[in-house]
UniProtKB/Swiss-Prot annotation:
The keyword Cell division does not apply. The lineage of its organism: Bacteria, Bacillati, Bacillota, Bacilli, Lactobacillales. Substrate binds at residues 123, 155, 195-198. S-adenosyl-L-methionine binds at residues 45, 70, 97, 119. Residues 125-130 are annotated as: Interaction with RNA. Signal peptide: none annotated. This is tRNA (guanine-N(7)-)-methyltransferase. Belongs to the class I-like SAM-binding methyltransferase superfamily. TrmB family. The gene is trmB. The active site is at residue 119. Catalyzes the formation of N(7)-methylguanine at position 46 (m7G46) in tRNA. It comes from Lactobacillus helveticus (strain DPC 4571). GO terms for molecular function: tRNA (guanine(46)-N7)-methyltransferase activity.
Length: 217
């Protein structure tokens, strides 16, 4: 979902190059250890929106590093504002295209990739734009560690069915699959961090679809 342009967000992003990396050269891998000042494990959210999910993760897990990969400047600014307010030194914001994820991250460099409420691109001619299309899966496989995995959530039943089939065709292994995440066992529900969109959608009684999958050796 595209956010309305906010001039303050653009200004804030431009003032903090130490926290926001904008349109990096896809020909050069990013030195994330230098950006974070440590070599802690990295987890990525692709398309972070307003950032409630990724900022909550960063706040709850100070021993891990997080990257919000977000194309929209306004969204990056909103995430940055929360990062600065909460002092989240373990969160970096990358303004870039998800199609270049394997250019931005070295091979075997991240433990988890989160795909939360991605654009379903329902028209057949737009299939290649879906973040669970086979070309994207191949790129995720490159940057994930051997024991790394993907966590995917959506409210769109069509995208969920497509993603299950796409991942299965790619030879992936499913560790967890749910067609109604918010009505799973209490211990699963308690661990779930909602996105802003997820909270609004689930509050109306609509199901949330979710899966965790990895690339079998």
């Amino acid at each position: 979902m595209r956010l309305r342009n906010k001039p303050w967000a653009v200004k804030l992003v431009n003032e903090h190059p130490e926290s926001v990396l904008q349109n990096p050269d896809p020909e050069k891998k990013i030195d994330w250890a230098a950006r974070f000042g440590n070599d802690n494990t990295i987890e990525i959210e692709v398309g972070s929106g307003k950032g409630h999910f990724i900022t909550t993760l960063a706040e709850n897990n100070p021993d891990k590093n997080y990257v919000a990969l977000e194309l929209q400047t306004t969204a990056a600014g909103i995430i940055l504002r929360t990062k600065l307010e909460k002092g989240l030194d373990n969160l970096q914001i990358l303004r870039g295209d998800a199609a270049d994820i394997n250019c931005f991250f070295p091979e075997n460099s991240t433990n988890v990739i989160y795909l939360n409420f991605s654009d379903p691109w329902p028209k057949t001619r737009h299939e290649k734009r879906r973040l669970t299309y086979k070309s994207f899966l191949a790129k995720y496989q490159q940057v994930l560690t051997k024991d790394g995995h993907i966590e995917f959530k959506t409210d769109n039943s069509g995208l969920f069915a497509y993603s299950v089939q796409s991942m299965n065709n790619f030879g992936m292994h499913f560790d967890f699959v749910s067609v109604d995440l918010h009505h799973e066992k209490p211990e699963i529900v308690e661990k779930n961090i909602e996105t802003e969109y997820e909270h609004k959608f689930a509050a109306k009684g609509n199901p949330i679809y979710a899966l965790h999958a990895d690339f079998e050796a």
